[in-house]
């Protein structure tokens, strides 16, 4: 059974995760309206701080990719696979579970998440500091207060 699960992951990662992108457009009530396959979109890399964004037209199922910042010639085009509102741990775990890689981008590498402190907890001991992971790329990292 374990071999079957591993085989499914390899197939999913190879053919769905990188060769084909399956996206579900939603209607005004956020209900899925179907699926679309976007093979060119699928070659774009993920970065939590990306240089492009995508939108879907739910009526035509057309996908549009637009630059969020200036993209220099030869620079990789990247999009976010998940919401930027999720904290590092949740986002990285979902990326690992769904796309089978560990994101190590600038935001994921920074315990403060580029100053957003999305994952930070208020310190119970001092009430003025934030508790953050010591190593945000380590899933089992210890956390400590910033003060």
PLM regions: where:
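Catalytic cores of histone-lysine modification enzymes
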Residues: 1-61, 85, 98, 104
């Amino acid at each position: 059974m374990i071999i079957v699960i591993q085989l499914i992951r390899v197939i999913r990662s190879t053919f769905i995760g990188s060769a084909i992108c399956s996206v579900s457009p939603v209607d005004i009530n956020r209900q899925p309206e179907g699926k679309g396959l976007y093979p060119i979109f699928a070659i774009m890399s993920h970065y939590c701080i990306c240089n492009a964004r995508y939108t879907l037209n739910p009526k035509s199922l057309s996908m549009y990719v637009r630059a969020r910042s200036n993209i220099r010639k030869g620079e990789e085009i990247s999009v976010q696979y998940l919401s930027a509102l999720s904290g590092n741990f949740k986002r990285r775990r979902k990326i690992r579970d769904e796309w089978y890689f560990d994101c190590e981008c600038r935001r994921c590498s920074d315990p403060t998440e580029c100053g957003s402190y999305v994952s930070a907890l208020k310190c119970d001991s001092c009430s003025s500091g934030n508790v953050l992971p010591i190593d945000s790329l380590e899933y089992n990292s210890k956390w400590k207060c910033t003060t």
